[in-house]
UniProtKB/Swiss-Prot annotation:
Binding site for Zn(2+): C28, C209, H234, E238
Organism listed in the record: Methylococcus capsulatus (strain ATCC 33009 / NCIMB 11132 / Bath)
Principal place of residence: cytoplasm
Keywords: Aminoacyl-tRNA synthetase, ATP-binding, Cytoplasm, Ligase, Metal-binding, Nucleotide-binding, Protein biosynthesis, Zinc
Pfam families membership: CysS_C, DALR_2, tRNA-synt_1e
Residue sites binding ATP per the record: K269
Catalytic activity: tRNA(Cys) + L-cysteine + ATP = L-cysteinyl-tRNA(Cys) + AMP + diphosphate
SUPFAM superfamilies: Anticodon-binding domain of a subclass of class I aminoacyl-tRNA synthetases, Nucleotidylyl transferase
This protein's encoding gene: cysS
Subunit (UniProt): Monomer.
Family of the protein in this entry: Belongs to the class-I aminoacyl-tRNA synthetase family.
Protein name: Cysteine--tRNA ligase
Cofactor comment: Binds 1 zinc ion per subunit.
GO cellular component: a single term: cytosol
Length: 465
């Protein structure tokens, strides 16, 4: 039975979907005013893994991940760039899709945009006003009345009195309560706006997700995910809005992935340790980055460093090395087990709150077993190799042909395959002539350019670092 850590109850719970064999899941997506950074990549990869595994279990998953395409940051960036908001957001939405494709992230079933959901947003705000959960402030903005929702703070564990007393609360005289948050912002000169019963304006960030999730998945659904940084106030506000508007319990399981750290420090533009996905992909293969993300438990901090990425690259190469040179479709001897319990161990790990590090450890045990059988029992090795590829596929890994993986250029050597093969032949001639110095020179020259030679009884193979 799959168990998920529920941020709402702060414990692991057996996952029981609202409808048998069907799962509805919503994840907060990007605010598209810049390129994806590693934090965005983690959200994309983590919840792609969740959706893949639920589908692997035979469940019908409806996965919704929104796009915030109107926001204060978007407006500021468009002004700075001297371009329209539409041009800015279109460019970064396309860049986001390129990055997620590179990382092996399957597209969500629905990707609603805030600007395409204005009618739903207006309807929800109207309902909240009717039910006494929202009001029009003295400045024309519409605010959510936090005091009207007794369960506010349940997700984050925040104490309302302490929040009110906190020095960080910005005092806004238009509000009845310092904790009240904006649902509809009245129009300001030079900013985009839409007509509403409360005057022209645009939606606040929090109401967008409530409106889009309930439209796509209904008032009550199974899983809501996002980064830990969104737990408060964003997800807390979503609960207040959605339950205030519908009168129903909003979400059964709340999932939050951990923070990204750079060299043991919090990732931050102000600290100068901020990396976009594109900057990382210029140095590392996309599959290495995906492997790196999944090799930490989704709730744990993810510590980015060159050393950790290099270790991920070496580890992934070991898995591909196990798959290299396997004979396809060899029949196993009668009664021979082609799995040896690896699939069961993998499932046990994944059923325990998507424990991908433990699941990946099973893949390495499987790879060692393949290597042990390669020479003496090729049929056994091939069968185990099929299991390794199948389990890797559940995580979106190990789907490239091993030879193609090792020979693809990951941004290192400029040598062509033909150049490399020519030098390997020259090295072979040197070895035949017992010219070991020349043989070593060619090997070292290739290594300096990121080409690793591997000698065996079957001959010499090569791979790019």
């Amino acid at each position: 039975m799959l168990k998920i850590y529920n941020s709402l109850t702060r414990q692991k719970e057996e996952f029981r979907p609202l409808e048998p064999r069907r799962v509805r899941m919503y994840v907060c997506g990007m605010t598209v005013y810049d390129y994806c950074h590693l934090g965005h990549a983690r959200v994309m990869v983590v919840f792609d893994m969740v959706a893949r595994y639920l589908r692997h279990l035979g469940l019908k998953v409806t996965y919704v991940r929104n796009v915030t395409d109107i926001d204060d940051k978007i407006i500021r960036r468009a002004v700075e760039n001297g371009e329209t908001i539409g041009a800015l957001t279109a460019r970064f939405i396309e860049a986001m899709h390129e990055d997620e494709r590179a990382l092996g992230v399957l597209p969500p079933d629905h990707e609603p945009r805030a600007t395409e959901s204005i009618d739903d947003i207006l309807a929800m705000i109207g309902t909240l006003i009717e039910r006494g959960h929202a009001y029009v402030g003295s400045n024309g903005d519409v605010f959510y009345a936090v005091a009207s929702f007794p369960n506010y703070g349940r997700l984050s564990g925040k104490n309302l009195d302490e929040l009110r007393a906190g020095e960080r609360i910005e005092v806004d005289e238009a509000k009845r309560d310092p904790l009240d948050f904006v649902l509809w912002k009245s129009a300001k000169p030079g900013e985009p706006f839409w007509a509403s019963p409360w005057g022209p304006g645009r939606p606040g960030w929090h109401i967008e997700c409530s409106a889009m999730s309930t439209r796509c998945l209904g008032a009550h659904f199974d899983i809501h995910g996002g980064g830990m940084d969104l737990q408060f106030p964003h997800h807390e506000n979503e609960i207040a809005q959605s339950e205030g508007a519908t009168g129903e319990h909003f979400v059964n399981y709340w999932m939050h992935n951990g923070f990204v750290r750079i060299n043991e420090e919090k990732m931050s533009k102000s600290l100068g340790n901020f990396f976009t996905v594109r900057e990382i992909l210029a140095r590392y293969r996309p599959e290495v980055v995906r492997f790196f993300i999944l090799n930490s438990h989704y709730r744990s901090p993810l510590n980015y460093s060159d050393e950790n990425l290099d270790e991920a690259a070496a580890a992934l190469s070991r898995l591909y090395t196990a798959l290299r040179g396997l004979a396809p479709d060899l029949p196993l001897p009668l009664g021979e087990d082609r799995d040896e319990g690896f699939s069961s161990r993998f499932a046990d790990a994944m059923q325990d709150d998507f424990n991908t590090p433990e699941a990946i450890a099973v893949l390495f045990d499987l790879a060692r077993e393949i290597n042990r059988h390669k020479a003496a029992e090729p049929a056994k090795a091939a069968a185990l190799g099929a299991t390794l590829k199948s389990l890797g596929n559940v995580l979106g890994l190990l789907q490239t042909d091993p030879e193609a993986y090792f020979k693809s250029d990951a941004g290192g050597s400029g040598l062509s395959d033909a150049d490399i093969e020519t030098r390997i032949r020259a090295r072979l001639e040197a070895r035949k002539a017992k010219n070991w110095a020349e043989s070593d020179r060619i090997r070292d020259e290739l290594k300096a350019q990121g080409i690793i030679l591997e000698d065996s009884a079957a001959g010499t193979t090569w791979r790019r670092e």
